[in-house]
């Protein structure tokens, strides 16, 4: 009799445990932390385009000290919730050859990833980078303001 009761109880407890697991890749605390910095969700990924606060000068990939501090503060807060993996997508405006822009955008992604790793105190190997050049503008390249907005790094939070 006891043998017949054990199997249904085990099965029921497994079902209930599965129902209690968090939905999606991220916890509510992680989602709240990402939203507090302006990250937006699209197709299950959370990303932030660092164009408003952290712009790069034309033909440059160096971070200003205040930009570096902003990145490190954000990384520390997100890492404190367990978000320790990300992808940095570097971008440029439309000036220059494709190969030059791809290299420059990769340098931008790498400098942001270095600051992110330092601020979050996470291994640099947890962060991937890619240089996308001028392929994905977010603003018109016909104006100086639009070109400035396109010189950016987008941070995409990933899972291990």
UniProtKB/Swiss-Prot annotation:
Gene name for this UniProt entry: yfiB
The protein's name: Putative lipoprotein YfiB
Family under the similarity heading: Belongs to the outer membrane OOP (TC 1.B.6) superfamily.
Signal peptide range in chain numbering: 1-18
Organism: Escherichia coli (strain K12)
Localization of this protein: Cell membrane
Record-annotated OmpA-like domain positions: 43-160
Gene3D superfamilies in UniProt: OmpA-like domain (3.30.1330.60)
Lipid linkage positions (N-palmitoyl cysteine): 19
Membrane topology: Lipid-anchor
Keywords of the record: Cell membrane, Lipoprotein, Membrane, Palmitate, Signal
Superkingdom of the organism of origin: Bacteria
GO biological process, one term: bacterial-type flagellum-dependent cell motility
């Amino acid at each position: 009799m006891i043998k017949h009761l054990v199997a249904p109880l085990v099965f029921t407890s497994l079902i209930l445990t599965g129902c209690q697991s968090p939905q999606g890749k991220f916890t509510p605390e992680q989602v709240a932390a990402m939203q507090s910095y302006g990250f937006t969700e699209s197709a299950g990924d959370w990303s932030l385009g660092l164009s408003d606060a952290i712009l790069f000068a034309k033909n440059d990939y160096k971070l200003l000290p205040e930009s570096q501090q902003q990145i490190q503060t954000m990384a520390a807060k997100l890492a404190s919730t367990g978000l320790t993996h990300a992808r940095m997508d570097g971008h440029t405006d439309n000036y220059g050859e494709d190969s030059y822009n791809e290299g420059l955008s990769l340098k931008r992604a790498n400098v942001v990833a270095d600051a992110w790793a330092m601020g979050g105190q996470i291994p640099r190997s947890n962060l991937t980078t890619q240089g996308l050049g001028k392929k994905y503008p977010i603003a018109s390249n016909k104006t100086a303001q639009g070109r400035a907005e396109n010189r950016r790094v987008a941070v995409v939070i990933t899972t291990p």
